[in-house]
Amino acid sequence: MKQNYTKLKPNFENIFFEQENDKMILNFGPQHPSAHGQLRLILELENEKIIKATPDIGYLHRGIEKMAENMIYNEFMPTTDRLDYIAATSNNYAFALGVEKLIGVDIPLRAQVIRTMLLEINRIISHIFLLGVQGMDVGALSIFLYCFIEREYGLDLMEDYCGARLTHNAIRIGGVPLDLPHNFLESVEKFTHSVPKTLDLVRGLLDKNRIWRIRLENVGYISQDFAKQWSLSGIMARGSGIKWDIRKHNPYELYSELDFEVPIATEGDCYARYQLYIEEIYESLKIIKQLIAMYPSTPKEIMAKDARYISAPKEDIMTQNYSLMQHFVLVTQGMRPPVGEVYVPTESPKGELGFFINSQGAPSPHRLKIRTPSFYHIGVLQELLIGHYFADIPAILASTNVVFGEIDR
């Protein structure tokens, strides 16, 4: 018998786009331009208000943690670029730091200066990318264009150092692959002068813009207790008055020797988080200027020395038999860290990024677990979106600054 489908009973299994009451089920994504990746939100709306939100993730899942268990430690390093691909060096560094704690090597001072400088350049790239994308999501297209000019300068710096603009592979276990190229510090110094001018321009266009304020203020409010319950970190926590930055409170690399502040806000809304992204860029510029002054007086070594785990300098590999054999073994068979486990947290541009590594003395990790901030920040949407209007989703989603490379691992 032929069925007759009416407006209230469409021919879609288990999906009712229009119902007899005012409620509606709507799919946001997984290919929506404001989704910041492969995000699908299953929304239940009552008129224009969200009464239920269910994030559906996994569209970008690649099994990265399992891949690590089948790769030697150095082989896995380029794969970490594919987590937060907006600030790839932060992933390289977090993994390298975890392995270094496991094998117990000391990093040369110059390598620490270079690594910290690259991390802060990446932080600026990530934050300024967020400002541009948030502006575009809310309707301020010109902000996107101004911010991407500065982002291009930052990517040019990374390209000058490692040859890559997005997936950098710029860190090595035990140090860095290269010293800074000729005139690199001069280019970085120009970058530190141009970024504040762009930020002043952005703030001049947005801070007193009535539409911008209406779209962000009192939208996406997160209280301190709510942030703690959901294990939020980075600006998502600091925007709610939680003064916690791993660089300051559990310092690594050179951060304990550097002068910088941890800006916080108490309002907890999208506008407060927007302000913090800008303030953090200023603090990163302050750190970079200190590192520029510190670099010339450092010894020239850029890699730790431990024949069990780290290859000799290339000059020795080319001229000494023992160094060549050691290098061959490390490349083909891999290092063998001692039995043990370690968890090392770092402050990535998105929040707390940590690697848990369990070693059984083999060339590959027995278990590797990655604690990524975006995973927690996307989960919070199932409560954060409730009560907001559908039009608020792009503004709220942008302020979380999630990237799906580190959510779908």
Swiss-Prot record:
GO terms for molecular function: NAD binding; NADH:ubiquinone reductase (non-electrogenic) activity; quinone binding. PANTHER family: NADH DEHYDROGENASE [UBIQUINONE] IRON-SULFUR PROTEIN 2, MITOCHONDRIAL, NADH-UBIQUINONE OXIDOREDUCTASE 49 KDA SUBUNIT. It comes from the Bacteria. It comes from Helicobacter hepaticus (strain ATCC 51449 / 3B1). It is found in: Cell inner membrane. The gene is nuoD. This is NADH-quinone oxidoreductase subunit D. GO terms for cellular component: plasma membrane. Gene3D superfamilies: Cytochrome-c3 Hydrogenase, chain B (1.10.645.10).
